[in-house]
């Protein structure tokens, strides 16, 4: 099933890209464990990484610091490698409230979660691709370091079907039930199967567009075919097929029975400890909760919160690292850590926060001590498991630079010839009035301005002041969720307003070519928000505009300011010299606003191919491409209902057209999911 990686791009590497590709490739071939790609904003770091992957032909995991950047990278990689397996692996929770106990108020908060089915399907598709083929790129968030089902158990549970194999129908149905597939002869949907005479239809959990038909003759598999579950159109006849479990956490019955015995032993030991310490309430609470879980596991094979017993279910010892997505990555895989100065500290912080919450649950008798082993990886475990790694950042952290040593690859020259912004330092005393005049000058020529302040109060006051003076301004603060944040950025690019004020939110991954000015207020206040890295990242937001400029308001030049200004000047000088030597005239970017959200259009079109000549792919309406994410979600629900209605009325062509449109809208929604 594996193919060769084939890079699809109208562009050839230029600027610093060819040298960066050569050095990274040579380093990996020489066995270097750590390399850093120091690439400025807009220098085509993703394109460089894509070229390295295509040259080396190795399965790759790309780690991003958040879902928004992961979605952006997924869209770019999907365009670069349309014929290969580009997968998306982020947290599948739309909403997640972990169980917790607050001793001060004696409040227990039950776990509450809402799972996004589309993202769950993409996660299953990602692990399947890693197990089946080598031309795989998995774009993941830091969710990848959290516990996942053991790959060995996952592989053992698979159901292999081949033409001509001898197996009776009941055996297949029993195996499907073990894989947690549910029989549903009425509503055929993902993760279900239906039976009609000697024909079994299975809708694989990792698929969103094709189902499997198993035709039996007596006790022999006579024919296997893939078909469109909506129209019934047969896509292809195949020789073999592997049915993967419906969930990563599926466990064989014998392992569950063994786990239950181990849990009983631990419960007896823990009860003894609690009674010795005169913790009668905690002992009663723990006994009651654990006994209930054991009964559920015995009857159903699972229970609510079964992940808290994951140590026993995966057969690990106390304190051992949990199985994660890294266990599915082949030994010669490649790891790319995007925006590494943010992602690496995140990986280190996940374990500590999780541990503190669970220790309270254990102490007060809500969970057994083994629940502490249901956790994300520790940083040391991540280091031990990580394959050869490329750290990608415009401002690499100390960790990456220390690990890479001399192996830091500079990518400063942009293919477009754009230079880093001009930097000016101006006094604090007149910063607000000076900023107002700069905003007005840019609003006239239809350019945008980003302003970053030190405190929430100052951001609110500045926004109010600018509004009073007739400026079109919005304020981006920490209470705004990802979806609304995407809407605000889109509105800024569309020209609904001219100025965006924020604190620490105007940094990594915001591609806004319309922004020509970045103003940093109180730049001389040394600290986290005004460190060298923060300043360089913020200045970089104006690097995609031909008139890019950054104004730092400060009465003195701090060490961080001096380093940031010096580094930016070094880059400008190198970029300018390259342009002179090669006769390049800088060109501004003309990136369509919908490009931020329209990540999966190409994917939707390729998936629509080859499913019957009666099908005509439906292009997404241009209006839909600029819908807000909330409106997109509502539109998706409406179309799902319409599609099922068409199918029930046997109007298969109309249902298929609606389904094509759904594919596109779901991909648009991923960006803000």
Swiss-Prot record:
Where can the motif Beta-hairpin be found?
Answer: 92-115
Instruction: Name the principal localization, coarsely classed.
Output: cytoplasm
Q: Where does ATP bind?
A: 39-46
**Subcellular location as annotated:** Cytoplasm
Top-level taxon in the UniProt lineage: Bacteria
The answer to whether UniProt assigns keyword Amino-acid biosynthesis to this entry is no
Q: Which InterPro entries match?
A: Helicase/UvrB_N, Helicase_ATP-bd, Helicase_C-like, P-loop_NTPase, UVR_dom, UVR_dom_sf, UvrB, UvrB_inter
Q: Can you quote a single GO CC term?
A: cytoplasm
**Record-annotated Helicase ATP-binding domain positions:** 26-183
Where is the Helicase C-terminal domain positioned along the sequence?
Answer: 431-597
Question: What keywords does the record list, in alphabetical order?
Answer: ATP-binding, Cytoplasm, DNA damage, DNA excision, DNA repair, Excision nuclease, Helicase, Hydrolase, Nucleotide-binding, SOS response
Protein known as? UvrABC system protein B
Q: Which organism is it from?
A: Enterobacter sp. (strain 638)
Name the lineage: Bacteria, Pseudomonadati, Pseudomonadota, Gammaproteobacteria, Enterobacterales
> Which gene produces this protein?
uvrB
């Amino acid at each position: 099933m594996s193919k060769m990686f084939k890079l699809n791009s109208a562009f050839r590497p230029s600027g610093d890209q060819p040298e960066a590709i050569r050095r990274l490739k040579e380093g990996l071939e020489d066995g270097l464990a750590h390399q850093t790609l120091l690439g400025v904003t807009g220098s085509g770091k993703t394109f460089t990484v894509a070229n390295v992957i295509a040259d080396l032909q190795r399965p790759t995991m790309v780690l991003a610091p958040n879902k928004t950047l992961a979605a952006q990278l997924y869209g770019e990689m999907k365009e670069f490698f349309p014929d290969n397996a580009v997968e998306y692996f982020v947290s599948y929770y739309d909403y997640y409230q972990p169980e917790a106990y607050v001793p001060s108020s004696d409040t227990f908060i039950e776990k509450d979660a809402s799972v996004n089915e589309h993202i769950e399907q993409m996660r299953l598709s990602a692990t399947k691709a890693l197990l089946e083929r080598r031309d795989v790129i998995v774009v993941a968030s830091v969710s990848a370091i959290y516990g996942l089902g053991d790959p060995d158990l996952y592989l053992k549970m698979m159901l292999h079907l081949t033409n001509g194999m001898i197996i009776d129908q009941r055996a297949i149905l029993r195996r499907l039930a073990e894989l947690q597939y549910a029989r549903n002869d009425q509503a055929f949907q993902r993760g279900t199967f239906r039976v009609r005479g000697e024909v079994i239809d299975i809708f694989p959990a990792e698929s969103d567009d094709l189902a499997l038909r198993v035709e039996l003759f007596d006790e022999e598999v006579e024919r296997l075919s893939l078909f469109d579950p909506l129209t019934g159109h047969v896509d292809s006849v195949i020789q073999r097929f592997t049915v993967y479990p419906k969930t990563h956490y599926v466990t064989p019955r014998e392992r569950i029975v063994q786990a239950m015995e181990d849990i009983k032993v631990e419960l007896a030991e823990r009860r003894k400890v609690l009674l010795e310490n005169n913790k009668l309430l905690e002992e009663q609470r723990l006994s009651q909760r654990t006994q209930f879980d054991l009964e559920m596991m015995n009857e159903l094979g699972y229970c609510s919160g079964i992940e808290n017993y994951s140590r026993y279910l995966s057969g690990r010892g106390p304190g051992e690292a949990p199985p994660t997505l890294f266990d599915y990555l082949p030994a010669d895989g490649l790891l790319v850590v995007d925006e590494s100065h943010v992602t690496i500290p995140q990986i280190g912080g996940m374990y500590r926060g999780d541990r503190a919450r669970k220790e309270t649950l254990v102490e007060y008798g809500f969970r057994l001590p083994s629940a502490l082993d249901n956790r994300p990886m520790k940083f040391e475990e991540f280091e031990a498991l990580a394959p050869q790694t490329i750290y990608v950042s415009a401002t690499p952290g100390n960790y990456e630079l220390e690990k890479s040593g001399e192996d830091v690859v500079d990518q400063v020259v942009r293919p477009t010839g754009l230079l880093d912004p001009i930097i000016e330092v101006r006094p604090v005393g007149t910063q607000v009035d000076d900023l107002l005049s700069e905003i007005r000058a840019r609003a006239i020529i239809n350019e945008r301005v980003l302003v970053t302040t030190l405190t929430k109060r100052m951001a609110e006051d500045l926004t109010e002041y600018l509004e009073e003076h007739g400026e079109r301004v919005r304020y981006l603060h920490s209470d705004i969720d990802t979806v609304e944040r995407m809407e605000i950025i889109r509105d800024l690019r569309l020209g609904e307003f001219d100025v965006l004020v924020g604190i620490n939110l105007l940094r990594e991954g915001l591609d806004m070519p319309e922004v020509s000015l970045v103003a940093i207020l109180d730049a001389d206040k040394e600290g986290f928000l005004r460190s060298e890295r923060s300043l360089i990242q913020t200045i970089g937001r104006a690097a995609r505009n031909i008139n890019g400029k950054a104004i730092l308001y400060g009465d003195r030049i701090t060490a961080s300011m001096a380093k940031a200004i010096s580094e930016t000047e070094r880059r400008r000088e190198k970029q300018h010299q390259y342009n002179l030597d090669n006769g390049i005239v800088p060109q501004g970017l003309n990136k369509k606003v919908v490009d931020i959200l329209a990540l999966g259009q190409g994917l939707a079109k390729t998936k629509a191919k080859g499913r019957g000549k009666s099908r005509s792919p439906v292009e997404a309406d241009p209006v839909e491409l600029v819908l807000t994410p909330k409106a997109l979600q509502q539109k998706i629900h409406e179309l799902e209902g319409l599609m099922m209605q068409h199918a029930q009325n046997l109007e298969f062509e109309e249902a298929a057209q609606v389904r094509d449109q759904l594919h596109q809208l779901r991909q648009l929604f991923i960006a803000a999911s």
